[in-house]
Structure formats: structure tokens, C-alpha cells
Curated annotation (Swiss-Prot):
Subcellular location: Cytoplasmic granule
Disulfide bond sites: C29-C101, C32-C95, C59-C70
The protein's name: Pore-forming peptide amoebapore C
Classification via SMART domains: SapB
Main function: Forms pores in the cell membrane of host cells. Has antibacterial activity against M.luteus, no activity against E.coli. Implicated in the cytolytic activity of the parasite.
Keyword Transmembrane: no
InterPro entries: SapB_2, Saposin-like, SaposinB_dom
GO BP of this protein: defense response to bacterium
Complex formation: Monomer. Homodimer. Hexamer; formed during insertion in the membrane.
Cleavable signal peptide: 1-24
The keyword NADP belongs to this UniProt entry's keyword annotation: no
Amino acid sequence: MKLFVLLCVFVLCLASQEKQQDREIPVLCPVCTSLVGKLIDLVLGGAVDKVTDYLETLCAKADGLVETLCTKIVSYGIDKLIEKILEGGSAKLICGLIHAC
């Protein structure tokens, strides 16, 4: 019986977490496109080496949505992100790839 109750609590926690993530995406998307737009400007302006520094500075101070976004970007990979920018990927496309839109 205890195992059943524990399993039910676990399933409810997972369901609650998924709903929270679904609610975050509409709010997270514009924040992401704005941030990725800044990264696109850096890369296309020839400051590829500044992308990592910019993200490290921002993410060190981040909380809430920006912290979530930083986690998504780091999980995706900064090198992959730069590669997508150089391939002509838009901010909306890149944010979709990192599951922020």
C-alpha cells in the first residue's frame, strides 16, 4: 500500500512539472528570441568569442525565466548555437530547437 501511495505521489509530481513547463513556454519564448537576437548580433558582428563571455555573465546573475533559458542554452550547446546562427538560423528557429518556443 505504501508503495502504491508513493508511486501516485511521484506520478502527480511529474504531471505537475510538465504542466509548469507548458505554462513557461509562452512567456519564455519572447525572452528567448530577444536573448538569441543579441547573440545573433554578436556572432554576425564578428564577436563570436564574446558569446560565451556574454552568456556566462548573464547566467551568473540569472534567476527565474532567464535561469531556465540559460539552462536550455547550455544543454543545447553554445557551439551548436553559434553554428546555427552562422547557418542563418533565426532567433525563433533557434529558440524552437532549445525548446523555449
